[in-house]
């Protein structure tokens, strides 16, 4: 056993004995245990290389699952990092966990950038990156996350593949077109630099040799001629046929994680006679006057199941800015509408999103949000 392996063993034993990396994390139920990684590093380092897939959202887990299906027989380690944990996150994490060789859920309820969370978590990620066997490919969607760079910088020779993260990949104002990671505070910035070296958003973007997109026919910010673009259909409605829509109409509002949207969402629901709201996976508040669809499924999977059960029902989906409008617009018996409050100024921050909806032929309905 070489000196490097001895040092890694000692460091891991210190971590396990004193619980340094678990001080602020008591709800992960062993999903961050590194014993298996240490065992591989010490005794099976020459085995078949692994592919890493990093996810931050349920949509990203759905894409990751499809990517894994295209590479049967290969080893995949999945890393989910999230500030949220609920029924939906657990359902889709367990789905992908069953298909991966290993899966890790980093639940960060206070966010990575909190001072007490940043340094121990980044240190944990760096240690675990060094415990991995040989890495062949790294897949990611959230280019702006410094946490992923802890792994990218450890394996600079690994192939980098990127994939879509909703509408972030379709608007020119996307954070994925940035240069450096946004880390607040000099101490945290200096520590991040120790963990990731000169890695940056731009370096990650430029290193990507292939990008998977779930949006067909829409201009992607990663489609700049530097890499292969691969279309990856995410939700399969090909076996469903449009019915005659004589079974009534179900109107559903897509929720938002932003609490500031509560009042305006309630007004929209009343204005358009919307009966249901599909809460966003990160939404923590309810809406009065509408019924919440409490389901472990994301809205696309939920609607596909409903169409199978009720092929003659008309489904109307209303949204302010959800990318699910784009993934559902071609479902049979589904009609998608974007909502625009009349009070929004001409230079409002959602303007690029509404331009995208127009490009996708999604009707935009303006309503009076002041009465």
UniProtKB/Swiss-Prot annotation:
A single MF term (Gene Ontology): N-acetyllactosaminide alpha-2,3-sialyltransferase activity
Pathway(s) it belongs to: Bacterial outer membrane biogenesis; lipooligosaccharide biosynthesis
Loss of function: phenotype: Cells lacking this gene do not express sialyltransferase activity onto LOS.
Main localization, broad class: membrane
Membrane topology: Peripheral membrane protein
UniProt keyword Glycosyltransferase present: yes
Subcellular location: Cell outer membrane
GO cellular component, one term: cell outer membrane
Keywords tagged on the record: Cell outer membrane, Glycosyltransferase, Lipopolysaccharide biosynthesis, Membrane, Transferase, Virulence
Entry's EC annotation: 2.4.3.6
Active site residues of this protein: 258, 280
Binding, CMP-N-acetyl-beta-neuraminate: 255, 278-282, 299-300, 322-323
Gene3D superfamilies cross-referenced by the UniProt entry: 3.30.370.20
GO annotation terms (biological process): lipopolysaccharide biosynthetic process
InterPro entries in alphabetical order: Glyco_transf_52 (IPR012477)
Keyword Signal applies: no
Catalytic activity reported: a beta-D-galactosyl-(1->4)-N-acetyl-beta-D-glucosaminyl derivative + CMP-N-acetyl-beta-neuraminate = an N-acetyl-alpha-neuraminyl-(2->3)-beta-D-galactosyl-(1->4)-N-acetyl-beta-D-glucosaminyl derivative + CMP + H(+)
Family: Belongs to the glycosyltransferase 52 family.
Annotated function: Catalyzes the transfer of sialic acid from the substrate CMP-N-acetylneuraminate to the terminal galactose residue of the lacto-N-neotetraose branch of surface lipooligosaccharide (LOS), forming an alpha-2,3-sialyl linkage. Thus, functions in the sialylation of LOS, which plays a role in the evasion of the host immune response by protecting N.gonorrhoeae from complement-mediated serum killing and from phagocytic killing by neutrophils, and which is critical for establishing infection.
Subunit organization: Homodimer.
Name of the protein this chain belongs to: N-acetyllactosaminide alpha-2,3-sialyltransferase
Species, as recorded: Neisseria gonorrhoeae
Lineage, uppermost ranks: Bacteria, Pseudomonadati, Pseudomonadota, Betaproteobacteria, Neisseriales
């Amino acid at each position: 056993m070489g000196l490097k392996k001895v040092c890694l063993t000692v460091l891991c034993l210190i971590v396990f004995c004193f619980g340094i990396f678990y001080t602020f994390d008591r709800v992960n139920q062993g999903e961050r245990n590194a014993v298996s990684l240490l065992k591989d590093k010490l005794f099976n380092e020459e085995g078949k290389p692994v592919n890493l897939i990093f996810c931050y959202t349920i949509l990203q887990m759905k894409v990751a699952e499809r990517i894994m299906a295209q590479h049967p027989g290969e080893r995949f380690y999945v890393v989910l990092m999230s500030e949220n944990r609920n029924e939906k996150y657990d359902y889709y994490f367990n789905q992908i966990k069953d298909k991966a060789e290993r899966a890790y859920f980093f639940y960060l309820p206070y966010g990575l950038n909190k001072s007490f969370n940043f340094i121990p978590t980044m240190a944990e990620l760096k240690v675990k990156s060094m415990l991995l066997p040989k890495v062949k490919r790294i897949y990611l969607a959230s280019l702006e996350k410094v946490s992923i760079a802890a792994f990218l910088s450890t394996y600079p020779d690994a192939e980098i593949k990127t994939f879509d993260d909703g509408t972030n990949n379709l608007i020119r104002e996307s954070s994925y077109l940035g240069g450096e990671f946004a880390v607040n505070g000099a101490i945290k910035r200096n520590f991040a630099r120790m963990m990731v070296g000169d890695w940056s958003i731009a370096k990650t973007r430029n290193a990507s040799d292939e990008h998977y997109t779930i949006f067909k026919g829409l201009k992607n910010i990663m489609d700049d001629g530097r890499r292969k673009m691969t279309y990856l259909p995410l939700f399969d409605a090909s076996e469903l046929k449009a019915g005659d829509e004589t079974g009534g109409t179900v109107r559903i509002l897509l929720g938002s994680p932003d609490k500031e949207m509560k009042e305006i969402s309630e007004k929209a629901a009343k204005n358009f006679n919307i009966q249901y709201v599909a809460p966003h996976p990160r939404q923590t508040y309810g809406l009065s006057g509408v019924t919440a669809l409490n389901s472990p499924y994301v809205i696309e999977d939920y609607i596909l199941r409903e169409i199978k059960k009720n092929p003659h029902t008309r489904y109307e989906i209303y949204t302010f800015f959800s990318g699910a409008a784009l993934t559902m617009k071609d479902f049979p018996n589904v009609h998608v509408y974007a909502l625009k409050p009349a009070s929004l100024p001409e230079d409002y921050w959602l303007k690029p999103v509404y331009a995208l909806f127009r490009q996708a032929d999604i009707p935009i309905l303006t309503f009076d949000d002041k009465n």
